[in-house]
């Protein structure tokens, strides 16, 4: 009898607990159900880890805003080599090289800085708050392997929004840059509170 009453109490508690969950409504025209080919598509993109892209970067935040040309962003697995040119804050050509958890930043005047905290170093040198370690994943249309995430898909079965680590990444446009791969992002807007980072990609290349 006691066991039966305990079971009823637990079941009642579980039902009561479930009724308190607040589900965030989905944006109109979007679903959190991945399309049938998502597993195959994301597998292709995750194995696409030797690449180079070119384009433009724009940052808007309360303290300032600015734009930069992405002369080249080369990714070899976890290792990145990113060259930016901008007149903002007299940056000139700035080079970022590193792996997750380590960065070397070289300014136009040749000064070089290293840090185990990439985001803090980039913010100190340029004034820009960029999610450096996650960008190589987000720019391909994939969540970073560390941290919870949420994916939302549009009516064309493309990834439309990725939410992770306090950022909302909106995939504004996809294009078939490389014949052997699914469509790749051509325009991305990343939002975090009052910060906005926009990347417009003009060229993707696959490297051996």
From Swiss-Prot:
Subcellular location: Cell outer membrane
Membrane topology listed for this record: Lipid-anchor
Signal peptide boundaries: 1-17
Primary site of residence: membrane
An annotated GO cellular component: cell outer membrane
Pfam family, one: LolB
Residues with a covalently attached lipid (S-diacylglycerol cysteine): 18
Residue numbers with lipid attached (N-palmitoyl cysteine): 18
Keywords tagged on the record: Cell outer membrane, Chaperone, Lipoprotein, Membrane, Palmitate, Protein transport, Signal, Transport
A Gene Ontology BP annotation from the UniProt entry: protein transport
InterPro entries: LolA/LolB/LppX, OM_lipoprot_LolB
Family in the record: Belongs to the LolB family.
Oligomer and partners: Monomer.
Purpose: Plays a critical role in the incorporation of lipoproteins in the outer membrane after they are released by the LolA protein.
The protein's name: Outer-membrane lipoprotein LolB
Species whose genome carries this gene: Marinobacter nauticus (strain ATCC 700491 / DSM 11845 / VT8)
Lineage, top ranks: Bacteria, Pseudomonadati, Pseudomonadota, Gammaproteobacteria, Pseudomonadales
Gene: lolB
């Amino acid at each position: 009898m006691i066991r039966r009453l305990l079971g009823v109490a637990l079941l009642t508690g579980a039902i009561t607990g479930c009724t308190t969950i607040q589900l965030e409504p989905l944006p109109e025209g979007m679903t959190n159900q991945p399309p049938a080919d998502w597993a195959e598509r994301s597998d292709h993109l995750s194995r696409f880890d030797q690449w180079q892209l070119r384009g433009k970067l724009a940052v808007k935040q309360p303290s300032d805003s600015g734009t930069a040309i992405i002369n080249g962003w080369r990714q070899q697995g976890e290792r990145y080599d990113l060259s930016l040119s901008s007149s903002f804050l007299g940056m000139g050509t700035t080079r970022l090289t590193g792996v997750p958890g380590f960065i070397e930043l070289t300014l136009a005047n040749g000064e070089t800085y290293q840090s185990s905290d990439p985001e803090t170093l980039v913010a100190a040198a340029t004034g820009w708050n960029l999610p450096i370690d996650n960008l190589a994943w987000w720019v391909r249309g994939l969540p970073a392997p560390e941290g919870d995430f949420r994916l939302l898909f549009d009516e064309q079965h493309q990834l439309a929004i990725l939410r992770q680590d306090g950022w909302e990444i909106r995939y504004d446009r996809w294009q078939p840059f490389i014949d052997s791969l699914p469509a790749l992002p051509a325009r991305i807007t990343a939002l975090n509170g009052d910060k906005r980072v926009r990347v417009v990609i003009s060229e993707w290349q696959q490297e051996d």
